[in-house]
Amino acid sequence: MELSRSSQREMMDVAVDAEDNAFDTGDHRLFARMPSSVSFNKLRKRLLRQVRQAFDGFGMLKGSKRWLVGVSGGKDSYSLLALLMDLKWRGLLPVELIACNLDQGQPNFPKHILPDYLASIGVRHRIEYRDTYSIVKEKVPTGATYCSLCSRLRRGNLYRIAREEGCDALVLGHHREDILETFFMNFFHGGRLASMPAKLLNDEGDLTVLRPLTYAAEDDLAKFAAAMEFPIIPCDLCGSQDGLERNAMKAMLADIERRMPGRKDTMLRALGHVNPSHLLDPKLFDFQSLSPEPKE
């Protein structure tokens, strides 16, 4: 008999509770920073459960030995790294982690923050300098958004670094809202049904892209990051631009969630329950040879 979602969540919470009893977070430098409040503990357990849900649901651990974890200095990537280190410290993530920051040459970028922080928590890391900022400023017309080109240049460099470090996966901090916003951007502006996949094989076929925060809410990650007092580095390149399509999607989703609480989770579940015969794409369903289903 298939368990309900609430039963599955309860079982995962029991598992995390049992692991907590056998695990002293104070033994690790990262976890010494953790607040001891009940509310934070609930938040942390929820995020850990959601990461493990993504691991199990999308087979993220299958064949994995070494991951390159992209760390930008924002709340999402800091939280991702902390949660992965949490699971690894418990023995629940049998994968080597390498944290990586790509310094893209943005003016006034605080170069010392990430190296100092990553060294302080004892994680293997690599800081790479590539001046993609100048390329983006040169190639993108005034008034246009930088996000697409900036992302492609960053991704290409991260692929290269992952190969150089012998990694089999690049792990990114995209969360529930990122996935929903991308879906609606493609829906409204691209005329297609597509979003960010939780697991993707790159075009060359040698690296997997993983998004373990697929089920995590942005608000939860913001609360987690604030409680952990991560040294956040703002993005002056993309964050300074107003009126982006993604911002419009974010505002739309926030308004829907405000008026109808729980709709974001419902929309995310919908992306995992696709019925090709009830859409209009003949590449996904053979409408030409459609015949009545046999009667019992």
Curated annotation (Swiss-Prot):
Main subcellular location of this protein, as a coarse class: cytoplasm
Free-text remark on how the cofactor is bound: Binds 1 [4Fe-4S] cluster per subunit. The cluster is chelated by three Cys residues, the fourth Fe has a free coordination site that may bind a sulfur atom transferred from the persulfide of IscS.
GO cellular component terms, A-Z: cytoplasm
InterPro entries with a match to the protein in the record: Rossmann-like_a/b/a_fold, TilS/TtcA_N, tRNA_Cyd_32_2_STrfase, tRNA_thiolation_TtcA_Ctu1
Motif PP-loop motif: chain residues: 72-77
SUPFAM superfamilies xrefs: Adenine nucleotide alpha hydrolases-like
Alphabetized Gene3D superfamilies for the sequence: HUPs
Reaction equations catalysed: cytidine(32) in tRNA + S-sulfanyl-L-cysteinyl-[cysteine desulfurase] + AH2 + ATP = 2-thiocytidine(32) in tRNA + L-cysteinyl-[cysteine desulfurase] + A + AMP + diphosphate + H(+)
Keywords: 4Fe-4S, ATP-binding, Cytoplasm, Iron, Iron-sulfur, Magnesium, Metal-binding, Nucleotide-binding, RNA-binding, Transferase, tRNA processing, tRNA-binding
Subunit structure of this chain's protein: Homodimer.
Protein name, entry field: tRNA-cytidine(32) 2-sulfurtransferase
Organism this protein belongs to: Sinorhizobium fredii (strain NBRC 101917 / NGR234)
